[in-house]
């Protein structure tokens, strides 16, 4: 079927599409056999095709076109023979990723007059390798040779089992038919002039185009001159210069200019005389672009066209010019063995000239430099950086270099050279089979790796302090910096530690000015003292403020260059955070000795710090801040005030509940959280009433607090903590009370099976928070027949516990004035949404929902 009209093109396209549909079901083995035999056929016909191309177009050299045809068959086959292009091409079981290659459909292949047969071979082979059909639109001046090449490949492919009509062509090409083909095919491979490529991109279908070349090459004074000149002549004379990547201008440094010029003449170049330049200019450039009559002609022929007598053996014509402007014909792409030569005062001047020439024409295409790769590395790097070209060659003939797999074997062989966004293309490399494939990615569900990280050593038991601290001697520690506040200091706890340190022959310094909250100003002051003392051990003694302070002091002591603002940057996933905490432990270790049963900070990576300038509280979190050693000695908790016992105990309860229902909860944290909850409900009331005398209750609460800390350190906390931190910061309420005021309302909010918003990436398969709250109720034996009943019983149990501990019922009862509450409501609601803890909550809240919960907690009646 001949194609000479739109109707015939439609009919042929339909036939090719049917063939491609069959071809798309072929296996990799079948495709590879077809690919191999088609390449063999191209190689067998290389001389016949080369002769046909030169005879028809009058361009280039038969001998070089033979090489190009051979290259298009052999090198393309060798490069891609083992590449997977059919079906599953990649399978990663651990990551649950499968990649599947599918053909695009029918490729519209636009063929240039300069390289008709080799380009046809290339595009046919990469289309067959990818199970695509291909429909050629030859250049009118190269239609016979293009069709001959296409038919050669088609016959071999069909003989090897490919569907008939998998390759087609336009017999009488025209602009109308070419444009129509580009509109109807699935993708266009456009190799040709700027107007044709622009038309392909405007067709309404995907297109891979090329761009014009205008390759500048610098010869540096460090270059091997003979190699540089020989390489440029090799490239420039290849097929009479029709390769778009061939050198168009050579820029030579002044210090070696005459040597280079002499070498060119020695190698057969003709240096155009000054009085001959205008004659050549008139011949090589017509109507603002290269004269088609010189394309692919020999240097001798072009000289004759200009009326200049040169030896028949002349290899290239060189015009010594100075202008870099658009008006200078030598400054443009010439597609023939005609070369411009510029003299540069120095390398900087050469670089400027090269940049100007690329901007004049050839953006994105190719550039080159000849320089010593060792001695002139800085110049090569500067050239590479300055050139807006996707191919920059060093000591390589650019025609051969751009073709690929020659002189550098990581450049893929190709006859369609993408020029990137600089050149108006979407491809910034040599085009190959991968550009003719749809890659489907099948992603199977995988869960993120979880972890369980706690201090290296956790010592516990009533009276264990003196035995645990003996480890410091074994670790050869010599200087300890104690961080505490006035309460434990006055209670002689510090004296107890000092006696142990003195017995161990460890020098010490005490900082006892930590306030009710860990604040940045105090921390920085303490860090200065710490830096002067230069300890190898930091001992945190106290509760959350002391632990938080010591953790941040540790960071600032070991890394004074860090900024608090960076440490406070929030993250969605602790493993993917933008700011990475520095490694700790090179200067000192951190020993955390808790004197209260509350947050469990002695085993967590958390630090709650207040910025004195803004009054805002920040929850810092990073496992680098996890203490190296934790000591949980209930003897240090016997004298805790009743109020602190109540607030810190409820804090531990909320930690446990939120860790158990967190989106990061795991089998490793669940057991700790549940047992901590049981212990708290059982022993907190007794510790509150008779804590100074009930050793068992104190010790059980100490265990519960630390277990809750371990659970929350690895499962993280939730919305109750987000809201409590902001409420505490704004209205000066202790964080334990703030958590107590909010927890019941948060449980009600979370306890739904159809939340308005789910957490972004939970570990659970579906919302099951009601079930999890019910399991807590079951674990502490509250009864109830349904999960909903059990949730209500849990809320009631918490309410009863708070009542027994004399904790306020509402925010209002906690002393917050109504006017102050409502004036801050919008702000703290928004801040709570953005808090670090919110992301781990099982139900993701809206700001309006947070606001509503705050209001409910403010108005709540006893």
Curated annotation (Swiss-Prot):
InterPro entries: AAD_C (IPR034789), ADH_Fe/GldA (IPR001670), ADH_Fe_C (IPR056798), ADH_Fe_CS (IPR018211), Ald_DH/histidinol_DH (IPR016161), Ald_DH_C (IPR016163), Ald_DH_N (IPR016162), Aldehyde_DH_dom (IPR015590). It comes from the Bacteria. Keywords: Multifunctional enzyme, NAD, Oxidoreductase, Plasmid. PROSITE patterns: ADH_IRON_1. The keyword Oxidoreductase applies. It is an enzyme of class 1 (oxidoreductase). NAD(+) binds at residues 420-425. Its EC number is 1.1.1.1, 1.2.1.3. It catalyses: a primary alcohol + NAD(+) = an aldehyde + NADH + H(+); a secondary alcohol + NAD(+) = a ketone + NADH + H(+); an aldehyde + NAD(+) + H2O = a carboxylate + NADH + 2 H(+). The active site is at 244. CDD domains: AAD_C, ALDH_F20_ACDH_EutE-like. Disulfide bonds: none annotated. One of its GO terms (biological process) is alcohol metabolic process. One of its GO terms (cellular component) is cytosol. Induction: Induced during switch to solvent production. One of its GO terms (molecular function) is acetaldehyde dehydrogenase (acetylating) activity. PANTHER family: ALCOHOL DEHYDROGENASE YQHD. Has both aldehyde and alcohol dehydrogenase activities. Can use acetaldehyde, butyraldehyde, butanol and ethanol. In the N-terminal section; belongs to the aldehyde dehydrogenase family. In the C-terminal section; belongs to the iron-containing alcohol dehydrogenase family. NCBIfam families: PRK13805.1. This is Aldehyde-alcohol dehydrogenase. It comes from Clostridium acetobutylicum (strain ATCC 824 / DSM 792 / JCM 1419 / IAM 19013 / LMG 5710 / NBRC 13948 / NRRL B-527 / VKM B-1787 / 2291 / W).
């Amino acid at each position: 079927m001949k194609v000479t009209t739109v109707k015939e093109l439609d009919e042929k396209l339909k036939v090719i599409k049917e063939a491609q549909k069959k071809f798309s079901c072929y296996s990799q083995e079948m495709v590879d056999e077809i690919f191999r035999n088609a390449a063999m056929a191209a190689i067998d016909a290389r001389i016949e095709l080369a002769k046909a191309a030169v005879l028809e177009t009058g361009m280039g050299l038969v001998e070089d076109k033979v090489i190009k045809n051979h290259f298009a068959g052999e090198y393309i086959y060798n490069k891609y023979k083992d590449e997977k292009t059919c079906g599953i091409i990649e399978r990663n079981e651990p990551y649950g990723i499968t990649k599947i290659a599918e053909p695009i459909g029918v490729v519209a292949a636009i063929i240039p007059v300069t390289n008709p047969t080799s380009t046809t071979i290339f595009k046919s082979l990469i289309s067959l390798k990818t199970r695509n059909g291909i429909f050629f639109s030859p250049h009118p001046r190269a239609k016979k040779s293009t069709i001959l090449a296409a038919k050669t490949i088609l016959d071999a492919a069909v003989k090897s089992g490919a569907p008939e009509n998998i390759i087609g062509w336009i017999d009488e090409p025209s602009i109308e038919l070419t444009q129509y083909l580009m509109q109807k095919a699935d993708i266009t491979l456009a190799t040709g002039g700027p107007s044709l490529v622009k038309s392909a991109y405007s067709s309404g279908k995907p297109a891979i185009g090329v761009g014009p070349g205008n390759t500048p090459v610098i010869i540096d004074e460090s270059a091997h001159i003979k190699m540089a000149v020989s390489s440029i002549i090799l490239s420039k004379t290849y097929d009479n210069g029709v390769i778009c990547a061939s050198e168009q201008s050579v820029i030579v440094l002044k210090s070696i200019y005459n040597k280079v010029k002499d070498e060119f003449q020695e190698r057969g170049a003709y240096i155009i005389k000054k009085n001959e330049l205008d004659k050549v200019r008139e011949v090589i450039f017509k109507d603002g672009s290269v004269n088609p009559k010189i394309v692919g002609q020999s240097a001798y022929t072009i000289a004759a066209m200009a009326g200049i007598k040169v030896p028949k053996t002349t290899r290239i014509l060189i015009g010594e010019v100075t202008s870099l402007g658009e008006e200078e014909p030598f400054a443009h792409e010439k597609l023939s063995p005609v070369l411009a030569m510029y003299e540069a005062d120095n390398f900087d001047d050469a670089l400027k000239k090269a940049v100007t020439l690329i901007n004049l024409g050839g953006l994105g295409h190719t550039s080159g430099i000849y320089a010593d790769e060792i001695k002139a590395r800085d110049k090569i790097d500067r050239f590479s950086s300055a050139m807006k070209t996707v191919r920059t060659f060093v000591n390589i003939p650019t025609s051969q270099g751009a073709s690929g797999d020659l002189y550098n074997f990581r450049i893929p062989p190709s006859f369609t050279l993408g020029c990137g966004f600089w050149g108006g293309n979407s491809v910034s490399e040599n085009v190959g089979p991968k550009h003719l494939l749809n890659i489907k990615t099948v992603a199977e569900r995988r869960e993120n790796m979880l972890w369980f990280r706690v201090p290296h050593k956790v010592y516990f038991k009533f009276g264990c302090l003196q035995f645990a601290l003996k480890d410091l001697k074994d670790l050869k520690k010599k200087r300890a910096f104690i961080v505490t506040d006035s309460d434990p200091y006055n209670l002689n706890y510090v004296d107890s530690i000092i006696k142990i340190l003195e017995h161990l022959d460890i020098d010490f310094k005490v900082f006892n000015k930590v306030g009710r909250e860990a604040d940045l100003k105090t921390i920085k002051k303490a860090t200065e003292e710490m830096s002067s003392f230069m300890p190898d051990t930091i001992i945190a003694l106290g509760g959350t403020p002391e632990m938080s302070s010591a953790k941040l002091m540790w960071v600032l002591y070991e890394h004074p260059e860090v900024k608090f603002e960076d440490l406070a940057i929030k993250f969605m996933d602790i493993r993917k955070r933008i700011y990475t905490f520095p490694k700790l432990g090179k200067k000192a270790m951190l020993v955390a000795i808790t004197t209260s049963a509350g947050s469990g900070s002695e085993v967590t990576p958390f630090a709650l710090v207040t910025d004195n300038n803004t009054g805002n509280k920040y929850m810092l979190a990073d496992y680098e801040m996890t203490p190296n050693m934790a000591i949980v000695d209930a003897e240090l908790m016997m004298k805790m005030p009743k109020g602190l016992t109540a607030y810190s105990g409820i804090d531990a309860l909320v930690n446990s509940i939120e860790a158990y229902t967190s989106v990061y909860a795991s089998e490793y944290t669940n057991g700790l959280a549940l047992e901590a909850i049981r212990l708290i409900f059982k022993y907190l009331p007794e510790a509150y009433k008779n804590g100074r005398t009930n050793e068992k209750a104190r010790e059980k609460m100490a265990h519960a607090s630390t277990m809750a800390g371990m659970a929350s350190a690895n499962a993280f906390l939730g919305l109750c903590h987000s809201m409590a931190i902001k409420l505490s910061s704004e209205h000066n309420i202790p964080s334990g009370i703030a958590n107590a005021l909010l927890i019941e309302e948060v449980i009600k909010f979370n306890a739904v099976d159809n939340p308005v918003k789910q957490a972004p990436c939970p570990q659970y398969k579906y919302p099951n928070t009601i079930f999890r709250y019910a399991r807590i109720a079951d674990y502490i034996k509250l009864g109830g027949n349904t999960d909903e009943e059990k949730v209500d019983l849990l809320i009631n149990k918490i309410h009863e516990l708070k009542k027994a501990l004399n904790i306020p019922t509402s925010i209002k009862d906690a002393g917050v004035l109504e006017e102050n509450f409502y004036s801050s409501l919008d702000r703290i609601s928004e801040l709570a949404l953005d808090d670090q803890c919110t992301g781990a909550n099982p139900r993701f809240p809206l700001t309006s929902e947070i606001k509503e919960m705050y209001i409910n907690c403010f108005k709540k009646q006893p």
